[in-house]
């Protein structure tokens, strides 16, 4: 943390090791949320956040990011804070859109946290996976924020070990202690051999992270070109993460779910309907117009998907999903 973000962290008191980021996030929520507390979430967002909040008795309050660039409206955000707001969840780089929150946006979020005395809970699992010279910054490094931020992250995405379940929360000592106590009562301990492996992984040379970004950037560009060739509207180029959030072709009459079903049946290609990431105003038509594509696949898998799309185009047998 000192080398990457310039933060002083006491490893004995400020870090809680958990079974993946998911447990670290859930434990963070359980450690600070009481019945009726409000938690701000950006919409769209990763679907498990809401469940953790409601399970803890909290109330999710959604702040929509505006498509197609997924911009943050400062006034809308500030209006969402109330005396009941206990925390705000910040995932950057962002799942599903690939957005990296800018320094200006982080400053706005931090101002709301300081003004309303609430906690920022971050999900930074894609912190090393950014593109086009974008840089990830943690909100904890801003003035007055380290003492009111709980950072959660893991090995899973950076080192492609999603099954190892090694994650952590970095927080002020009192919060880290509460998170550790919750972790002990739920899963007892993260696997010790994997913790040893984690130390080796986290000491990887900078060249590893640069190579990782380069490989995924090529895969991102490959998928953008592929989807563009069959009519998808790619109006936002992912700045980070492993996902492409693409809008259905303009002339497509299907919903996101219907399109995904057709794609599976006719091409054998699987993507995720976008509506599962939206939780706010369901009257917004765009919420049923997106799909999420994961490009963290082998070259062989991506080429096979491209071939299947190509066969559909050449056969002209699939007017519902090829435009």
Give residue ranges: language-model regions:
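PLP-dependent class I/II
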Residues: 2-323
